[in-house]
Amino acid sequence: MKEIKIKKPIKIRKPTRSYTGIMWITNGTNKKYLAPDFDNRCAYCDDSDEYSGGYNSFHVEHFAPKEKFKHLEFTYDNLLYSCSYCNISKSNKWIGSNENESVLGNKGFIDPCNDDYYNHLGRDQNGNIISLTPLGEYIYYELKLYLKRHFILYNLDQINIRRRALKAKIKEKEEHGEDTRKLVKVHRLVCEIFCDYYDLLVKEEA
Ligand SMILES: [Zn+2]
């Protein structure tokens, strides 16, 4: 059996809904509150909207589908900020016979605001999303979490964190009149890697 080393959780941070129990009756208003609650990241795959079409391309996802549970269409506790890929893949899939029955056996979905989500999905050392359990495998395939774009966007994000930190360090050294040549070289290299991943993303979307 192939050994998988888990290095990281699927998401940088577990999101929390700040407006539990509240209902705004437009998705536009809900989305304004969902974006910061979810750190401008897809609830399921953690893609940042920064390199992925921005706020306008992200969707308001209904955990329990609104086609089956009309009364939950604007219930904040049922809503998620989601990339179009996960939202469209999930569509109106729902295994249970009522709104509270999101899992039956090894099939179904878990709300990523729930701790249990992180027991079923993770990331390997390269940033690929991996399933950890049979239920995780169901979610992985149903949401198409195997798409290459998720791996590319994760790495773009990680490289960008390093790029920004290096830039800040160079600025700090410059202010103290220190030699920055080595750091500038590393920064240039990191920028080149960033561009390589960006090209990959553009190719993937073409
Ligand atoms: Zn997503």
What do the PLM-derived regions correspond to, one by one?
Residues 2-44, 69-71, 77:
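Short, charged surface segments at domain edges that flank catalytic/cofactor-binding sites
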Residues 28-32, 115, 164, 181:
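Generic alpha-helical secondary structure signal
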Residues 42-45, 83-86:
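Short cysteine-rich clusters marking metal-coordination/redox-active sites
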Residues 47-79, 90-105:
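Histidine-centered nuclease catalytic patch
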Residues 90-165:
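Domain-level detector of nuclease and nuclease-like folds
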Residues 138-206:
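C-terminal, charged low-complexity interaction regions
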